[in-house]
Amino acid sequence: MKFFRTLFLAFAVFFAFAAQAADKVYPVSVKINESISTDDRGTKYDDPLAAALKDANLGEIVGGGNSVNKAGKIEWAGIDLEVTDLQKSIPVIKQKLIDLGAPKGSTIEYHSGGKKVVVPVQ
């Protein structure tokens, strides 16, 4: 009986860790090198990018904003994502941004192995 109890506990611990790993999300930031309003960014980038991530079951958009200079001009737009698999998500995000016409200087940023990784879109 002790053997089965130990075996049961081992399986319970294994499945608890497996479920926890499945729920892991990774933050990713996209910097779009374009002066674009929040509404226009949503239409041009956010909505299609969200659909691509959802279709691939890789994550979602969780926020965004614009960087504004002292004169009040938008310098660049940002999109915040949470993805479930960095290896699969980054190529999907990059290709979608290329397809959507993200300009040169746009980047995808995330952390891996304790280091910041910056991937140019173009």
Task: Say what each PLM segment does.
Residues A22-D80, T84-Q122:
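Long, contiguous binding/interaction regions
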